[in-house]
């Protein structure tokens, strides 16, 4: 799954990592952090339920769909289908939301620049969730 090349680099098997998420979760997302540097972090995460409109104050976000498909909305625009192989990008403080389309796992590879602290989740409607109900980190490499 992970092999250290040297103290400054590594190799991750995303196809293998995306199969290791639990079948169900008590949070909206479960993630596996691959890197966690101040300048940027990289994660693989699975979505378990529709994710209400929210934003992050600290980082720009790059999301590559590595499994499944879902509906995605950025900045109150139109919903569009996000599917495997598509890269989605948005700047910090951009509102976004995700809806599941079927019962297949929806998994993303995410790069946050700079690193996004786990507490940096702000729901448009605060009643929709908290950092604790939003995401759980399954494993850090």
Model-derived segments and their meaning:
Residues 1-45, 52-53, 123-141:
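A short, N-terminal "cap"/entry segment at the start of jelly-roll beta-barrel domains
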Residues 26-28, 82, 92:
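Residues that act as N-cap/strand-start positions at coil-to-secondary-structure junctions
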Residues 34, 42-46, 62, 79, ...:
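Conserved hydrophobic/aromatic beta-strand scaffold that supports enzyme active sites
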Residues 40, 49, 58, 78, ...:
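A generic "binding-loop/recognition-motif" signal
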Residues 48-50, 84-85, 91-93:
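Tight coil/turn sites that cap or link beta-strands
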Residues 54-55, 89:
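Short glycine/serine/proline-enriched coil/turn segments at secondary-structure junctions
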Residues 56, 62-84, 94, 99, ...:
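A short beta-strand-loop-beta hairpin characteristic of the jelly-roll/cupin
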Residues 92-120:
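Ligand-binding loop in jelly-roll beta-barrel domains
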